[in-house]
Curated annotation (Swiss-Prot):
InterPro entries in alphabetical order: NDK-like_dom, NDK-like_dom_sf, Nucleoside_diP_kinase, Nucleoside_diP_kinase_AS
GO molecular function, one term: ATP binding
Cofactor requirement: Mg(2+)
Name used for this protein in its record: Nucleoside diphosphate kinase
Species, as recorded: Dechloromonas aromatica (strain RCB)
Function: Major role in the synthesis of nucleoside triphosphates other than ATP. The ATP gamma phosphate is transferred to the NDP beta phosphate via a ping-pong mechanism, using a phosphorylated active-site intermediate.
Pfam families, A to Z: NDK
Family recorded in the similarity comment: Belongs to the NDK family.
């Protein structure tokens, strides 16, 4: 099993519901350690830059608007197979399709306000962690 790092964002809808601690508890009880964290209110520029991969998609403006609608909690997580484990804990993007007991099934309202973001691959995890935690060593296991 590989020790990995992944980026997680608790989105404005979940922050507003005051469930950060409940989500952190799920990370920790599933072997994911929070190794860096910060709460911030993203600017349009930051959100647009972070989600630039979606720039040409029809939902881009709504995504940026949503991600700047309130504070977010951003954390780097570390653990065995952290990327896949976090994605399993999050559940399907659409909370209506998410398995019971997942973060999105329990705390998300819609496919747009879906509570959390998580990196989808080692390459994106490294880029995403560096975006929010510049200078942080993103090589797992050091």
């Amino acid at each position: 099993m590989a020790i990995e790092r992944t980026l997680s964002i608790i989105k404005p809808d979940a922050v507003a519901k005051n469930v950060i601690g409940k989500i952190y508890s799920r990370f920790e009880s599933n072997g994911l350690k929070v190794i860096a964290a910060r709460m911030t209110w993203l600017s349009e520029q930051e959100a647009g830059q972070f989600y630039s991969v979606h720039k040409e998609r029809p939902f881009f403006k709504d995504l940026v608007s949503f991600m700047t609608s309130g504070p977010v909690m951003i954390q780097a997580l570390e653990g065995e197979n952290a990327i896949a484990k976090n994605r399993e804990l999050m559940g399907a993007t659409d909370p209506k399709k998410a398995d019971a007991g997942t973060i999105r099934a329990d705390f998300a309202e819609s496919i747009d306000a879906n509570a959390v973001h998580g990196s989808d691959a080692p390459e994106t995890a490294a880029v995403e962690i560096a975006f929010f935690f510049p200078g942080m060593n993103t090589y797992a296991g050091r």
